[in-house]
Amino acid sequence: MKHRLFLLATLGLLLVLAACVAPAPPSVATSAGGESSAAAAQPAVVEAPAGPTGSLMVALSLEPNSINPPNGADRMAGNVINQIFDSLMSIDNSSGEIVPALATAWEVAADGSLYTFTLRQGVTFHDGSAFNAQDVVATFAAGKDPANAYASAYDPVVAVVDDYTVTIAPVTPDVTFLRRMAETRIISDEQFAAEGNAGIESHPIGTGPFQFVQWNKGDRIVLQANPNYWDAGKPHLAEVIFRPISESSTRLAAIQTGEVHIVNRLNSDEAASLTGAGQVQVITYPADRVYYIAFNNLTTGVGLPTENKLVRQAMNHAVDRQAIVDGLFNGHARLSSGFVTPSNLGFDESLAPFAYDPDKARALLSEAGFPDGFSIGMACPVGAYTNFEEVCQAIANYLAEVGITMEGGEVQFLESGVYWDKEAAKELPPLFGDSWSASVGEALPRLNGALDGMNASYSSWSDPEIDAMLNQIAQTFDNEARAALYKELQAYMLDNPPFIYLYEPISFEAINSAVQGYVPNSVEQYELKDVSLNQ
């Protein structure tokens, strides 16, 4: 019982501390459609200056693994990439609608098999070269490099019609394709031809609102305003500096002292300590991000007890996720029942999360043929997510209570960059922790990313039934019919869990009151071309 007693004592202490120091959190603003919206919490808008001015300091919760678009493995990498590179279209932060960017118009074949894009003319890259159709071709050619984290996302076939028209054909019809394209950042054909992906990695050249200056590893990434940006009057900032600060408490101190202007992934106690601070505003919203412990049946988990669905059900029942959420997040998270969240199309609110029931867990293990439990390896990243190391340790302790112990006696904790590389190479242990967001408004990319077998870099599981359901969802363009398919999938994945489902967090960000025009979103994605500083 020592693991259980230790964990409960630890969580009890955290709850006592939370009750002592944490006032009620800032309210969450939610739009009529159910999407989280923190826009109402912004400072009053002031008119931006005529030309770029001011230096915005942004804290990152971890060092990006890469700033080459197809290789950026995490949201922090993406937040730097998004300022340097543009995509063919964008998602409007306020409305959630698809809007033109490097493409001014597009047509979609009735069966979703072909997309034709009309490209914006007069756009230049940061080195002065002209943007045209060849750059779209180069983007997909560069992305296909198997060394990239998201190589499988670049499978579609691109063809040039003329200098400012391209067609893109997905391998199979995909209802989320246009929204995925809003995440596909366009690189320079000239740079790729001359320098390859290595050149893009060391000094990326895009068409975005900010251009790359330098990256001092462990210290800062410096960007400066693109003076020839195609979106007239933007950006408003002269400079953006990203500061990787892995320790949450250090990020808190940095926003308190004015060293940085924006921080995210604060915990609830840290956010509460900022409430009422004169120059700092706290914004909170439900994140469209699911945390989980993956089961691996592709490589390291082959032939292990976790291939038995009763074992996987048992492990879900073994973990008291509510105690973890209460103890480590002051209750500011929703327990997950699957990979479709309340803001996603087709969410089934009738499906309850696995109940904490260690006796049922033991009974299921016995029924599966493992009455004495077993030993298994588990890994988690360090510094990637709020309190995640503590979450992983708590899970290991709960599993030990039903006889499932860690190989080597402990969870393997790895630096996040090393961790993502091992995850992409399918070299992590049979259990590993991670999270997925879904920036397209529904869960399909998240589901594909984690469950597409050996085809996707960060997937861990393959199930022919799930594969068939996902293929059907991707090819169903009627929203009502697709929502029904999502519900079928959720029920199947609850009975045949490919993960230990954990939680969907409430996100806490803090911004300096001088920051104007900043609109957070549910996937923690920064778009800074509209931001200015009131100095």
Regions found by a protein language model. Give the residues of each.
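Aromatic- and charge-enriched surface segment that lines or borders ligand/interaction sites
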Residues: 104-147, 161, 167-169, 254, ...
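N-terminal lobe/hinge region of extracytoplasmic solute-binding protein
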Residues: 59-110, 141, 205-207
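A bilobed periplasmic-binding-protein/Venus flytrap-type ligand-binding module shared by bacterial periplasmic
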Residues: 224-228, 287-314, 327, 505
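Surface-exposed binding/hinge segments that line
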Residues: 116-118, 150-192, 214
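Ligand-site clamp/hinge motif
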Residues: 142, 228-273
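Detector for C-terminal structural segments
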Residues: 216, 225, 291, 318-347, ...
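Structural transition elements
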Residues: 302, 334-367, 382-390
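Gly/Pro-rich hinge or "lid" segments in bacterial periplasmic/extracellular proteins
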Residues: 92-97, 182-235, 239, 359, ...
